[in-house]
Amino acid sequence: MNEPSACSGPPVKSKSSKNEPFYTLKALLPPYSEIQGNHDLLMSYELGPVEGGFSGSRRVKEKISSFLPHIIGEFHLDATKEASSLRALIEKPPIHKEISNLTSSSMQGFKLSAGPVDERYRHLFERRKEEPNLAYSEKLNLIRVRQQYDAYGFDDDETEKGFPKKHKKKKKDKKRKKEKEELGDAEKRKRAADEPMEF
């Protein structure tokens, strides 16, 4: 029995891509094939009638909404029936008159007048008295939720919350004092080195 050798297979090309004349252009032309670019594969495999059934002039019975069941409402609209085309918007604009400014008498309807708050909106302003967690701002005329005060900080983890803030402050003060002393000693040594030695 002839066992297949480890190097069996198609011969490996020793030509590198550097020897090719241009990028993606090989020295040899591709081999001749009966199937060319202008060859109709649908007709050769007798699939012409199947393709004509999908893309022919026959009207499709199903609407777009049948393929998109998750969209609510009727969105299969005909532009010719609804007259919602761009040409109809240009030829027949919806505004036929000139836009004019409102008169002073017409603007009186938009003017705010001082008076008691309507009963429908009175509960918005009475909420701040009932709930202590709400803070009212007169400047901005709004009600915002006041955050609960935490003596140990909002972002501290549980291990840090076990120690009071005073303990942390003492540690920081000691550290700063030690750093100042070290800086003072370093300055003294520098001055002593810069001074000329007397004999």
Swiss-Prot record:
Pfam families: Med19. It comes from Caenorhabditis elegans. Its main location: nucleus. This is Mediator of RNA polymerase II transcription subunit 19. GO terms for cellular component: mediator complex. GO terms for molecular function: transcription coregulator activity. Residues 164-178 have a biased composition (Basic residues). InterPro entries: Mediator_Med19_met.
